[in-house]
Amino acid sequence: MRKLGRYLLEGRLGAGSFATVWKAYDPELDTDVAVKVLADNWASNADVRERFLAEARLLRRISSPRVVRVHDVGVQDDRPYFVMDYVPGGTLAEKIGHCRPAEALHLAAEAGYAVQVLHDTGVVHRDIKPSNLLLDAGRTPTAVLVADLGSAKQLADASGLTVTTGTPAYMAPEQAFQTGGFDGRADVYALGVVTFELLTGRKPFGSGGRATLTTEQASTSSPPAIPSDLGVPNGIDRLLRAALSVDPGDRPQTAQAFADALLSQGGGEWAPARSSRPTRLVVWLAAIVVYLVTAVLTWLVR
């Protein structure tokens, strides 16, 4: 088993262009942790290295149960790493196509409240997507934590790096096309994409998002409607169309407002209306009951 500092690496949780995250065991504290390690090909880049460590400091500064917390930093073989909470429930990506509307809307609202914590501390995430939203199955109901601040606007501004960061399918038009400054409403857009994907199992604009369209196409495109057979209230469809608006001014203005609207528009009635026709199982059970009653009555008459 590979060792990093005092931490025993047990398996890879995820990897990106700049870093890899491992599940690890801390023998001194007898607990599981997650360790993020800067990629070897970036370790000698001073700007990237500082941005990596700045992410650790930023996560440490944000004290909230909705954001993963950093507990330690270190360097091994000239590669910096930092140690975070290990959240055992996986990520929202594993829920795509596998949750009912009620659960989807609960998880999306939880994600919105987690993103609001970042915004309250002046942080715009810029890469909200299912794999960066962790599920804490140890809480009831399941809570969502936000992770990976490596693309946060504050870190990019401080480092001087000008490369557009984010995942195209979840990027707001103003972020994808760099049409000027952007704020937390870009994260609200991403939350809209995540919610649509949780409900339908697919992204509203395909894997490339609006970033693959021309500027003109992006400005006139609108998301497809949510299929009616999902039983999702009409208010949710309208809310998602607003969240995915090209104009940030037409979106919910905060992540919390988006989350609140998800819960209030849903009204708690998520299941599609059931058919009034009896199912085959019910018919068979009724037939069995009639048969048994008839048999008993016949025996008593004898």
Write out the residue ranges for each language-model feature:
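C-terminal lobe helix-coil module of Hanks-type protein kinase domains
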Residues: 169-267
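Conserved short submotifs of the Hanks-type protein kinase catalytic core
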Residues: 77-91, 95
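Activation-segment/catalytic-loop signature of the eukaryotic protein kinase fold
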Residues: 73
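Activation segment signature within eukaryotic-like protein kinase domains
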Residues: 107-108
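AlphaC helix of the eukaryotic protein kinase fold
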Residues: 39-61
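Protein kinase catalytic-loop region centered on the HRD/HxD motif
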Residues: 112-123
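Conserved N-lobe ATP-binding subsite of Hanks-type protein kinase domains
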Residues: 20
